[in-house]
């Protein structure tokens, strides 16, 4: 099973598209954990309506504690072998979960995937790597570590690429890796970027 954690805060405009992309996954063995982080728009009503139609959706309500706390709350409820994060103003392709699982084996800890930045009149594909699949080991893993920790020269020149590796979304994580090591998101107010430290 894949646990999909969706932190929600005042994204009613985009939330239906996000949830539709999740409930319509071709890989059906998923749970969708939506953490409403104190939304003041009609996001809670949208979440309630979707949860009433699909038993795979769990809605958790909390006061507005921030993105990190919402993701951590979702992790507490995750029951899947795998976990992924989808922001509530994003959506994923209908074969996303199926495709990701097809690239995993018993030794996989995390599977990263590319994404598209959507704007009103343009789309910008963001490719993480040039190859379709890469396994990092030996000396090549040091390059990956450096990329996860800080932006490289190209990213500093093109800031739109900075989040390509450091985000929580765009990845399928082995749940046991997160839970056994007690990994959690540190609130952004403490470190400035919650995704980077988690990764």
Pin down the residues of each PLM region:
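Acidic helix N-cap motif at the loop->helix transition within catalytic regions
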Residues: 16, 41-49, 61, 91, ...
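Cell-envelope/extracellular polymer assembly enzymes that use nucleotide-activated donors
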Residues: 1-3, 21, 31, 197
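A conserved acidic beta->alpha catalytic loop
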Residues: 21, 28, 36-45, 63-65
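Short, well-formed alpha-helical segments that are part of the catalytic scaffolds
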Residues: 10-24, 46
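Short hydrophobic beta-strand elements that form part
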Residues: 3-6, 33-34, 61
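Short aromatic/hydrophobic "clamp" motif used to bind/position activated sugar donors
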Residues: 83
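Glycine-rich, basic loop-to-helix element that forms the pyrophosphate-binding segment
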Residues: 62-78
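Donor-binding/catalytic cores of nucleotide-activated saccharide
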Residues: 67, 88-199
């Amino acid at each position: 099973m894949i646990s999909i954690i969706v932190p929600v805060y005042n994204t009613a405009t985009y939330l239906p598209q996000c949830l539709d992309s999740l409930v319509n996954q071709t890989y059906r063995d998923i749970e969708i954990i939506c953490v409403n982080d104190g939304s003041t728009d009609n996001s809670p009503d949208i979440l309630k309506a979707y949860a009433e139609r699909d038993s795979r959706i769990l809605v958790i309500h909390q006061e507005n504690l921030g993105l990190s706390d919402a993701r951590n709350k979702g992790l507490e409820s995750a029951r899947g072998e795998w976990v992924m994060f989808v922001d509530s103003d994003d959506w994923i392709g209908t074969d996303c979960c199926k495709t990701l699982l097809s690239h995993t084996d018993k030794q996989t800890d995390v599977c990263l995937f590319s994404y598209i930045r959507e704007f009103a009149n343009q789309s910008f594909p963001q490719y993480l790597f040039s190859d379709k699949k890469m396994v990092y080991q030996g000396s090549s893993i040091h390059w990956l570590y450096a990329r996860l920790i800080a932006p490289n020269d190209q990213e500093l020149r093109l800031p739109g690429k900075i989040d390509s590796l450091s985000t929580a979304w765009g990845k399928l994580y082995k749940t046991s890796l997160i839970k056994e090591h007690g990994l959690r998101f540190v609130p952004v107010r403490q470190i400035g970027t919650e995704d980077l430290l988690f990764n």
